[in-house]
């Protein structure tokens, strides 16, 4: 059985890990980096770029470069947070037919899981290159505060990428796994404060030894799925735009190219200000007007940045307070504070956390890698490679149904350990009511309309009876991925209706299958492109070596031979400029054929003892050898 890899699918960066010799190892990508930007770009020639290559060209291709798409996953277009995002990103966010928030690039509308699948494919390929075998199974992490639709959409992204998602695991829980696996025996209670690129989570986790088993039990979790490093960047971008407007009277907000450069500069400045007291943002030729080009040059101090984001940092403290209250634990009883997510490198964030919990956070946990490592450990647990580890996670939000008067009646309270199953009996509101609609909700509000609607279904053919007499048993069942299955049963007739909750939007199975096929088609196109590039390289190498051979041969080549070879060289050069691999292969064969007699003639002359050619000369004259070496070298650098 192949390895089950662990993937941290982040808003800003993603990371992949695998368990080797009992230790979680982060795998470097093809560029040699341990994390990969979660950025996807659609180039003009149809090529799909993922990661660093997409990030590098973002400034020149802002409309077709998609970033922070995780913030849209499983969301409706009308949601306030989506409407806010539309004003901030240079790419288009559009309303899908089912009401979901989708994105548009290169004139094509796509679902967020499709975009995330491109990042997952890159992670999958990274793992396959390292392991030297096919990878088909993964554990993927999500923010603990993700609702059912968002979890389902993440699972869909895995399917589109060709992965069997064995488990969806919460990011703070994964970080605790990475931290706690090699800790001394005994009980610890830890706080995982996870402030990533787009989401914030806090979890209270108890790590205990139970009958020789390492038990990780989540006591409570809280968070905000629209608060992260991207918001910190945005504050800095707004400040730079305002400063430039004061100085030049020009508004950069309407210039996507300038905004993309500002985004890059703001992120860089924010990172620099974590280790230095001030930095310069210097962007020459940011825009131009009738008087000529304009340059942006703004000095920013750490104090200025802190004043811009103070309320964002403060916003993370209330969820910490609620999580402690829900867990029934005082801050003084926390043994360790673990910081996860790149944004926790900011000194102001670290100070706010240590002030609130009354202790310094641990420095031995890598905030960018811990989540992927924890996912890899969970993968090994599921594969049976790691024994004696038990993970008890919780449902982050209350689940219930809408009852008479527009009230939400809870069936499963928030912070209930999962997997879990709960049933409750309801009845009809009217006499002789023949059907009931089960409206499934997720959230903490008493008013049904104020909560997230996960879906509706009907239980029909209820025998006529006075109101309040029929007994309808509603069962909620949450699996280990935190995904909900709902059933309703008429106890009188035994008639039953069951559904796995797909958001009243979400992707249908047909749509997912189509996206899987599209992804496979892209993989096939990539393979063809690679083969074409290899054929072109082989053609170029043969042209070069043949020309060198003719030059070296001098008058040993007859005029007829020279003419025939030159014609074949020109034909091959023309073929190499085209996109037909078969044509290139045919011209390579043709040139090899017409140049072979000359090559043999020269080889025969060199082989005579009187000629005594040096061995390296002989190797250089052999056209075929040169072609092979060139071809291999080019392929290695791909």
UniProtKB/Swiss-Prot annotation:
Coiled-coil positions: none
Keywords: ATP-binding, Chaperone, Nucleotide-binding, Phosphoprotein, Stress response
Annotated disulfide bonds: none
Native organism: Pseudomonas fluorescens (strain Pf0-1)
Purpose of the protein: Acts as a chaperone.
HAMAP family referenced in this protein's UniProt entry, alphabetically: DnaK (MF_00332)
Transmembrane segments: none
Any GO molecular function: ATP-dependent protein folding chaperone
The organism's taxonomic lineage, starting at the top: Bacteria, Pseudomonadati, Pseudomonadota, Gammaproteobacteria, Pseudomonadales
Phosphothreonine, modified sites: 199
Bias-annotated ranges (Low complexity): 604-613
InterPro entries reported for this sequence: ATPase_NBD (IPR043129), Chaperone_DnaK (IPR012725), Heat_shock_70_CS (IPR018181), HSP70_C_sf (IPR029048), HSP70_peptide-bd_sf (IPR029047), Hsp_70_fam (IPR013126)
Signal sequence extent: none
NCBIfam families (alphabetical): PRK00290.1, PRK05183.1, prok_dnaK
Segments of skewed composition (Basic and acidic residues): 614-625
Upregulating conditions: By stress conditions e.g. heat shock.
Region (Disordered): 602-638
Family (UniProt): Belongs to the heat shock protein 70 family.
Protein name (record): Chaperone protein DnaK
